[in-house]
Every structure is written in C-alpha cells, then in structure tokens.
C-alpha cells in the first residue's frame, strides 16, 4: 500500500499542500499508529515542506520521513534523517529502498554524551547545507536532555529563517526544552493543534 500512496503523491503538483485524505492514506499504509505522528502534525509538516525552500533535517524517523520524502522526490532538496536505533534505521532504509527514495540520506547516528545531555553523533563526512526546516521528533523523551541537543549542536547549520517543528509539546518536558533553547538563541514558539500537541519554533 505504501507504493500506491507514493504513486498518489508523485502525481500531485509540487506546491500543493497534501490534503486530509492524502495524510490519512499515508498513516494507514504506514500502520505503526501507536507510535506514528498524529494526522494533524503530519499535515502541518507537509504544509511546511511545500512552502519552504532549502535543506530539511529530521531528528528521529517514521511516518514523517516518508511524508517528507514523497513531497521532496521531484526536487533537488537535501533531506537528512538522523536515527539512533540501528534496528529501526535498517528497517526504514529497506522501505526507502523499496520505494526508490534514494534522495533521502538516512543516517544511523547513535546517541552520545555532550556533557549535560545526549544527542546524535554526527558523522564527520556528512555535508549539510543551510537547513531551512527541522522536523524534531527525536530522540525519545527517555534520553537525558530529550531533544534539547538540537540547538546547541546544530545551530551553525540552521538558516536564520529556519522553522523547527516539534511534536509532543502537550508534554511538559518538550515545553521545558523550548524554554531552555533561549540560552542558545532567542526563539519564539507557537503551539498548534487542538491541544497544543505540536509547535513551530522560529528565531527572534
């Protein structure tokens, strides 16, 4: 079913935001509904992908990875995905290979200690363009520091008008991370979704 959904996306106009049916079909085809991003968040991510220009970074991987990959397939945008779990990385890589998504750079990046928090170990040979959009779904909240490491480790790669999309901001831990980011850079956050389940974070 994923191949049929990918074919459906390939037939759409590049600047068209995916509709509710597109998102629903993708979620059903993905199947991992207990852990997958919510429909509202997926649609929000899709809208930002088609409206933005430049490189995209995703922290963590899953349904959002396939969504962004489908929307970027006919473009020359760099799309880098960081995944710490080797088993899950290999599983998703097989899916990407099956769908012919060679434009996605899926990186196995184990979590390492940065002093006070853990974050992905970035391969030295990885070349990263100026990042226009970040989809921040990882590392998991059980990781020391959660998703905090994004800003202190990646700030030099983020464009001045970069937008960071963070899921799960109905949880206190994620909101505290956004507050802590102000120590690295002035940021503004807008919570979105029926219960504020995700947020847009931009630089002041």
Predicted regions and their residues:
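Class I SAM-dependent methyltransferase Rossmann-like catalytic core
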Residues: 18-51
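Conserved class I S-adenosyl-L-methionine
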Residues: 52-62
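Conserved SAM-binding loop of SAM-dependent methyltransferases across substrates and taxa
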Residues: 63-74
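Conserved SAM-binding motif I beta-strand of class I
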Residues: 77-83
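Short alpha-helix immediately C-terminal to the canonical SAM-binding loop
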Residues: 89-90
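S-adenosyl-L-methionine
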Residues: 93-129
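A conserved mid-domain beta-alpha-beta active-site/ligand-binding segment of alpha/beta enzyme cores
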Residues: 114-152, 198
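C-terminal substrate-binding/active-site "lid" region of AdoMet-derived donor-dependent transferases
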Residues: 139-204
């Amino acid at each position: 079913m994923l191949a049929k959904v990918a074919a459906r996306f390939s037939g759409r106009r590049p600047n068209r935001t995916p509709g509710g049916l597109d998102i629903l079909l993708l979620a059903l085809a993905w199947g991992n509904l207990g852990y997958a991003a919510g429909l509202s968040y997926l649609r929000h991510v899709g809208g930002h992908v088609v409206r933005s220009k430049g490189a995209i970074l995703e922290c963590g991987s899953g349904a959002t990875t396939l969504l962004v990959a489908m929307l970027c397939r006919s473009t020359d945008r760099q799309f880098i995905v960081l995944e710490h779990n080797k088993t899950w990385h290999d599983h998703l890589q097989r899916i990407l290979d099956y769908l012919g998504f060679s434009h996605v750079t899926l990186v196995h990046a184990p979590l390492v200690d940065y002093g006070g928090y853990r974050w992905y170990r970035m391969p030295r040979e990885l070349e990263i363009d100026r990042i226009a959009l970040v989809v921040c779904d990882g590392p998991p909240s059980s990781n020391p520091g959660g998703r905090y490491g994004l800003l202190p480790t990646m700030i030099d790669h983020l464009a001045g008008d970069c937008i960071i999309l963070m899921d799960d901001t109905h949880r206190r831990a994620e909101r505290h991370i956004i507050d802590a980011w102000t120590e690295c850079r002035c940021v503004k956050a807008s919570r979105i979704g029926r219960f504020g389940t995700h947020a847009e974070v931009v630089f002041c």
